[in-house]
Structure formats: C-alpha cells, structure tokens
C-alpha cells in the first residue's frame, strides 16, 4: 500500500501545516549524528485542547512507559512521527471500514482513541528530549574536567622533563673524574613549568606519553673518589699528637709533685728541729722525744733512717700574770733528762771522792746536797753542762740545733732555762709491773722521814762498786722511743759508747714520753662549765712522764715569775 493511501483517512484532522514539522532523517540514515540534532527544532503547541469536556483522562500504557525509561527511545524519538502515522493509519482503517458499515457511534470511539494515542506520543517525545538534554550536560562537564586534568598533567610532564635533563647534566659532570662540572642550564620556560613540589604525585601513565609504566629505581649517589693525603699532613698530625701528649705528661708530673708533699705531710714522716716525731701505729699516735746528742760518740753514725710520720711538739698554753704562756713539753723532758744526767755524773764523782753517796731512790736529784769535789773533778763534771741544759745560761741568744728556733718571748730577759733542775721536783711514781713493793703500785717520794734521810743514805750504801742501780737514772742523754719504734734516731743506742764508765755498762736505755701536763687544782679552781682552765695566773704545773712504758712519774714544776719582757 502506498504512503498517500495510508494518510488519506486523516486528511480531515486538524493538524498544523506541514511547514511547521522538521525534516527528520530515517533511522537507517548514516547522516544522523548527535551534532546535527537540535532541540530547538522540535516545536510543538501544547495549548490545543484535544480532550472534550466530558471525555475521561487518557490511560497510559506500558509502551509509553517503556519508551520513556529506555535510552534507545530517546535516540529513536526522531522517527516517532512516521511510526505514529503508520499506527494511526493501521488503526483507523478498520475503524473507518467499521464506521462505514456500522454507524456513527463507532466513529466517535475511534476518534477518542486516536487523540489519546497522539497525546501519549507527544509526552514520550518530550521526556526523550529532557533525557537527551541532561545527558549532553553531563558529557560537557566531563569534557571540562578532562581538559583541566590534561593541562595539569602537561605541566607535570614538563617539570619532570626539565628535572631529568638536569640530572643527566649532573651525572655527566660527576663522571669527569674531578673536573669542574658546569652549572645546570636554566629551563627553557621557567614560567610554564615550575619546580615540582615534594607532595606532587608521579606523572600518570597516559597513552602516547614518555612516562614508563614501571617506575625506575633511584640511582645511588656516586661519591667522588677520595685522593690520598700527602705524607706531610700525617707528619703534622703526629707532631700535634706528640705535643699534646707531652703537655699532658708535664701537667700530670706537676700535679703529682704538688700532691706528694701534701700526702707525705698527712701520712708520711716529717721532722723539725725540736726533735719530736709522731710514730703511727694501730693503737694511735705516741709522742717520742729526743734528748741531747752531744754525749754520743763520734764512731756511731748519727744518721739513722727515719720512719716517723709527723712532727707534733707537746705545747701547752697556760695563763700567767694575765698572759698566756706557751710551755714546750720537749723542753720539760730535756730539762729533766739534763738535770738527771748532771746529777748522775756528780753523784758518781761523789762516790769516788767522799763516800757520801746517800740519796733517796726515787727523788729528783738537786745539786745542793752533793759533796764537795776537787777542782779537777769539778771542772770535768761541769764540762759540757751548758750543752745538757735546755737553754744555756747567758744573755738568751744562744740556741742549740736540736732545740730549734725558740720563740722570742721565751729567751728575752731570761738568763737561764725556763725549767731547770731546781724548778721540777718528782712527786710520786706509778709502776705498772706486778712485782712492785707497794700493793697499789704507787711509790711515794717522801715515804720516810725527812730528818733522817741522811742516815738512811749512809746506811744503805753498797759495799763495792755499784753495778746496777735500782732507780730510774738513765745512762744516755737522748730519749729512746717505745719498744718496736725507731722513729727518733735511737737505734745507735743499742750498743753503748766506749767512753762511758763501767757503772753504766749494764744499763739499758729508757724512753721518756710526756703523757700530760696538768694545772694545780688549787689554783685552777675557778673554771667554767666546760672544764677549761681560767685565765688566772698559775705558778705551778704537774708533768706526767711515761718511762720505759712501765712507769709513770709525776713532776711538780714551778713556773717563772713575771718579768719585764711581755710574754706572747
């Protein structure tokens, strides 16, 4: 059937003129494309009222909904006009034949169906156009995003290319074996591709780009080969190290030289001219005192190895006439030893000449009761007496070597020793040996009557020459330290000199040590709460001496009176 025959029954319908419809190409035409389609070409007038006032609303079918939901319906909406005409022609042909045969009622129903079909077609075309328009907008947005991404990637590729060229230049310069590498060339377009930032991701692998799909590992930094140093620098370093070592050694020697004397003073042996030394022991420190050395024979070597630790003179400050008088304990011992030595010599001469040898056994000999001697004997006995005393009589300017430099106040305005044989008197003895005559070991000096002392002396005289005297008289003028100690040059006293008398041959040397110096309790009664001696003047002191480590002897010494020379 020809196309004009199909459209003939619809000639009486009120369609718009044909010039208003656009020319749509067929579905099989290759000239149809998205660029040739324009939504403005579809111009329909929806103001025409196609429904009668009493007509029911049209019912949408599944075909219209399926056409609205499928994207192919939008693409094929251009050919909806031809299909609609064909459908209307197919449906109108039986209705027309029916109307011709049946009557006018069937013609009204066909007209209503035709109008409903047209409305559905127009709604489907409108929805198709809306979907196409939305799809085109989405495509345009994607194109814009892709263009921005392409521009960004192009800039990154340019930066990577410039960085690659710079790295190649640096590698070429480093391979020149020490040759100065030229500076890297400036990029051709610095404003177009700036230097890459550390947070920029690597370039995307795009089709046709020079970026490899597999990442290239980083090249290891090649350090230039270190040239060997000349030997001159090594020699300088060696000299510098040797100099520093020498300075350190000198500094160490200086420090040791400063510390060793201090350590010796603290823990080692030290001596002074006063003749006192400290002997360290596990029980404490013992003060040993040396006596005069003039009685030692020249054949004995006076220089004996010394092993004392510290010089500690026995000093005591006592109030006297409103001043503090310094008492040297060494002088006390030397004075007592000198007086005993002198009295021992005088008593020996007295035994030979007069036969009056009586004297108390434990008393301190005072040269007042000695029998008169001949002139020659007196000269021999008085020879060297000044050397045995602590200070020789005279103007006070003579000093002995073993006494050392005494204080100035000690020798000013004094013509004799401060403590001589007439100033110190033995009070009592305390013997530690268990074979003492007394039960308590105390031997008083004045145990017998004073009136008949001379008779007792004469009655107790020995018949022959005295070989060993049972008293505390010593045979040597120098003090001997305690047993087991050799700190005061006393080893040479183990063999007595030959020039001594036979009466002294069997005697053993004894040691005298000052134990304490006490004040008279009757004069020092005014004391404070701490037991200190008051500043009042004292006229008498008591000196306790340990003899031979077995006997304590207490002496009462009278202090000299006030002189015109100030003390201390």
From Swiss-Prot:
Regions of compositional bias (Low complexity) in chain numbering: 1-13, 60-78
Ranges where the record places region Disordered: 1-29, 45-134, 479-510
Triggers of expression: By dithiothreitol- and tunicamycin-induced endoplasmic reticulum (ER) stress response.
GO terms of molecular function: DNA binding; DNA-binding transcription factor activity
Entry membrane topology: Single-pass membrane protein
Location of the protein in the cell: Endoplasmic reticulum membrane; Nucleus
Keyword DNA-binding: yes
One GO BP: response to endoplasmic reticulum stress
Residue span, bZIP domain: 111-171
Transmembrane residue ranges: 241-261
Similarity-based family: Belongs to the bZIP family.
Annotated protein name in UniProt: bZIP transcription factor 60
Organism (species): Oryza sativa subsp. japonica
Taxonomic classification: Eukaryota, Viridiplantae, Streptophyta, Embryophyta, Tracheophyta
Gene name of the encoded protein: BZIP60
């Amino acid at each position: 059937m020809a196309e004009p025959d199909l459209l003939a029954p619809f000639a009486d319908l009120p369609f718009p003129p044909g010039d208003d419809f656009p020319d749509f190409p067929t579905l099989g035409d290759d000239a149809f494309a998205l660029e040739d389609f324009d939504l403005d070409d579809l111009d329909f007038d929806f103001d025409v009222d196609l429904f009668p006032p009493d007509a029911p609303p049209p019912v949408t079918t599944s075909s219209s909904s399926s056409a609205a939901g499928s994207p192919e319906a939008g693409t094929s909406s251009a050919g909806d006009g031809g299909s609609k005409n064909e459908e209307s022609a197919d449906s109108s042909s039986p209705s027309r034949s029916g109307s011709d045969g049946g009557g006018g009622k069937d013609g009204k129903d066909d007209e209503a169906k035709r109008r409903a079909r047209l409305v559905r077609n127009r709604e489907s075309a409108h929805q198709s156009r809306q979907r196409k328009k939305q799809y085109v907008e989405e495509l345009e947005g994607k194109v814009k995003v892709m263009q921005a991404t392409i521009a960004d990637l192009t800039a990154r590729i340019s930066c990577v290319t410039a960085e690659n060229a710079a790295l190649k230049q640096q590698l070429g310069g480093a391979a020149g074996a020490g040759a100065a590498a030229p500076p890297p060339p400036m990029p051709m377009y610095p404003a177009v591709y700036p230097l890459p930032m550390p947070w920029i991701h690597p370039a995307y692998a795009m089709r046709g780009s020079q970026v490899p799909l597999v990442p290239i590992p980083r090249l290891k930094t090649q350090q230039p080969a270190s040239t060997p140093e000349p030997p001159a620098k090594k020699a300088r370093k060696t000299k510098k190290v040797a100099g520093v070592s020498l300075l350190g050694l000198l500094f160490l020697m200086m420090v040791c030289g400063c510390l060793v004397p201090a350590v010796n003073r603290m823990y080692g042996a030290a001596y002074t001219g006063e003749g006192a030394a400290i002997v360290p022991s596990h029980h404490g420190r013992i003060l040993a005192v040396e006596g005069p050395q003039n009685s030692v024979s020249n054949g004995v070597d006076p220089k004996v190895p010394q092993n004392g630790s510290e010089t500690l003179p026995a000093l005591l400050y006592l109030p006297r006439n409103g001043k503090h008088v310094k008492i040297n304990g060494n002088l006390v011992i030397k004075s007592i030893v000198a007086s005993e030595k002198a009295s021992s010599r005088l008593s020996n001469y007295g035994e030979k000449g007069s036969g009056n040898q009586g004297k108390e056994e434990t008393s301190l000999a005072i040269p007042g009761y000695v029998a008169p001697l001949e002139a020659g004997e007196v000269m021999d006995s008085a020879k060297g007496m000044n050397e045995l005393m602590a200070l020789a009589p005279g103007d006070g300017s003579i000093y002995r070597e073993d006494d050392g430099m005494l204080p100035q106040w000690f020798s000013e305005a004094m013509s004799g020793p401060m403590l001589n044989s007439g100033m110190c008197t033995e009070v009592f003895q305390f013997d530690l040996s268990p074979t003492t005559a007394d039960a308590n070991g105390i031997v008083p000096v004045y145990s017998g009557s004073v009136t008949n002392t001379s008779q007792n002396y004469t009655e107790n005289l020995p018949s022959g020459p005295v070989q060993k005297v049972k008293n505390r008289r010593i045979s040597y003028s120098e003090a001997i330290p305690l047993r087991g100690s050799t700190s005061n040059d006393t080893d040479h006293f183990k063999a007595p000199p030959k020039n001594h008398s036979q009466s002294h041959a069997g005697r053993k040397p004894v040691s005298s040590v000052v134990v304490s110096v006490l004040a008279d309790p009757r004069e020092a009664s005014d004391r404070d709460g701490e037991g200190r001696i008051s500043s009042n003047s004292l006229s008498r002191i008591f000196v306790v001496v340990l003899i031979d480590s077995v006997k304590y002897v207490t002496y009462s010494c009278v202090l000299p009176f006030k002189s015109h020379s100030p003390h201390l």
